[in-house]
Amino acid sequence: MEREEIVSFLDEYLSISSYPDKSSNGLQVEGKEEVERIAFAVDACLDTIAKARAFNADMLIVHHGIIWGGVSYVKGLFAKRLKALLSSEMNLYVAHIPLDVHPEVGNNVQLLKLLNLEPLEPFGEYKGIKIGYIGEFEEPKPLPMIAQILAEKLPVDYVRSYEFGLQEIKRVAVVSGAGGFAIEEASEKADLLITGEISHADYRTAEDLRVSVIAAGHYATETLGVKALMKLVREKFGVKTIFIDSPTGL
């Protein structure tokens, strides 16, 4: 399969150029023209690159790439990561915000699906766009039950539940990864915010606004879109794929 055919499909399907994002979405590193084996991971780090090489991957598709806000110098850790990719002629394709917001394979839609919810409306204002969604249960569910479902379905050792608001939850807002910025909006539009992680300051914001938050793991909540995209690419192009798990515990 030609690289450009895969890249063109991903660029269009994920609307790569439609979002303001410093993470240089799309093909970050150009490698082999022919692609038969594709590795998928959350992060492009030395661990996942090495495991992709062991799989003999022609392309690595990730949520977090190696370029953030442009390149000034090619040295240090950046040089090591780049060398690891170039030495094996491995393509690196990145979908950061585009994979958060996508209405079919996106992290946030997939997070709602774990709770058997459908996206009702966009949520989570970030640089002028909504990157998350709101879903709604037909009948209210106990907050501990929701936390337990996520703990069972996500690749995470535990979830943190900050029970500052309602115990019976009907409207759920989701923002994968670091979604603390959406706490204020959640206090106005939902009974619960589900995200990956929050900061110390975010904790106090949620406490003062009396809104409950579940932090289910930054890494764990962002495996969902990558895995959904992997399934789509495998079925569409008939390539061999692998998901490389490299958890951070965060």
Curated annotation (Swiss-Prot):
Binding residues for a divalent metal cation 2, per the UniProt record?
H64, H218, E222
Q: Does the keyword NAD apply?
A: no
Name residues in a coiled coil. none
InterPro entries linked to this entry: DUF34/NIF3, DUF34/NIF3_sf
A Pfam family of this chain: DUF34_NIF3
| An MF annotation (GO) of this entry | metal ion binding
Query: What S-S linkages are listed for this chain?
Result: none
Which of this chain's residues are annotated to bind a divalent metal cation 1?
A: H63, D100, E222
Q: Which GO terms describe its cellular component?
A: cytoplasm
The UniProt keyword set, sorted, is:
Metal-binding
> Assembly and interactions?
Homohexamer.
Homology family: Belongs to the GTP cyclohydrolase I type 2/NIF3 family.
Instruction: Identify this protein by name.
Output: GTP cyclohydrolase 1 type 2 homolog
What organism does the record attribute this protein to?
A: Pyrococcus abyssi (strain GE5 / Orsay)
| Lineage of source species | Archaea, Methanobacteriati, Methanobacteriota, Thermococci, Thermococcales
